[in-house]
Amino acid sequence: MALTGYASPAWTGQHDASIRQSQGHLALAVGRIKGVLPLLHTPAWALHGDLHGDLVTQKAVLAEAIQLPHSTKVLDLGPRAHAGLKPPKSWTEVRRHTRQVPLPSEGDVHLPKTRDKQARRFVREGGLVAVESGHENMAWSHVERLHAASRDRKGLSSHQRRLTPLLQRLAAEPWTFAVTSTNAEGEVVASGGFVLLPCGTCVYAFGGQERSKDSGRASVAMLGEAMRAAQRMGANTFDFGGSQDSGVDKFYAEFGGVPVAMWRWVKAPFWFKWMFPKTWSAWTEPSRVLDMGA
């Protein structure tokens, strides 16, 4: 049977270290901190990954990752991690979150009233929203461009050298699709790349927008159309991918996205937090959203 979702070889990169067992999968990559310290980590595209199965299965997959020789590890377990999982002693456990909305099995996908008005206004003013799948690399080129631009604005690395070939491979897969929003002037101002997982979840994996007067409404229209496309393809849950940015998280919440816990396990030498305080802080900053019940 062909591997789909995050278990697919389409995700494999030059430094891929993913663990694949018959009952489970954990996406991993190998890198270096400051070009020196070896790092085993969950790739940025798989923070809301595909760890699944019962407790015994998940323990077996994680045990294999834990035993790998890297002194520094950052493992993101995703929203389907079993509640009974516990990190090894000396590891740091961090609670983060994504947001999800259920999709109806039939009938229309309804957006909250304010979001629906914004999407309709974008189209009424000449905007066009298109869903493309298969070998439509033009749509995915917009996903790449706007994803990188959005991360650059936030001061985050876009990993362009690895992102470009990755999106080219994903564009050819039947379990992915891209959505673009084009304004009345013919400019693509918002786009997203989406991944359908075997569990029935559709993940907003890549995306971004231009800074313009209509980019906000364009993004709303793009996500609304993505939710409808996911429903047509058999998805029962739409996952916004999670964001630690409070503004972005609020944007997802206004779509009706409900917070779902995701756990991160971090292992590092005892001196790491003093040598690399900013990196340690970024890795271990917890989500407060679940505490607030937002």
Regions found by a protein language model. Name each.
Residues 44-84:
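A gly/proline- and charged-residue-enriched helix-loop-helix capping module
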Residues 34-44:
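Conserved acyl-donor/pantetheine-binding loop and adjacent beta-alpha core of acyl/acetyltransferases
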Residues 57, 139, 247-248:
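Short phosphate-engaging motifs
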Residues 15-17, 68-72, 176, 232-235:
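Short, high-confidence coil segments that cap the C-terminus of an alpha-helix
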Residues 61-64, 165-167, 173-277:
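Aromatic (often tryptophan-rich) hydrophobic motifs at membrane interfaces
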